[in-house]
Amino acid sequence: MGINIRDFDWSRISHIAEHGIEDYEVEYVILFDKEFVLRGRNETYCVFGVTENGRYLFVVLAIKNGDVAKIITARDMTKKERQYYSSRR
């Protein structure tokens, strides 16, 4: 599933930072390693990806105005999610 992103809405950056995730890591996963994207609930997308440093992230986002990604949350993948992600690649 392809999602085209022009810009990011970081209004929840403090929440994301609580998970120890940096904005550049989220951007990398969404822009460069977005081959595994699932449709979530309430018009959201779940993106599974690996940062350029090998960190496995799970990102939830919503698309606003057609091409702006509002990052709702981001965290490290659980062990089970990593296994699922690896089996689907």
Region locations from a protein language model:
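Ribonuclease/tRNase effector modules and their secretory precursors
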Residues: M1-R89
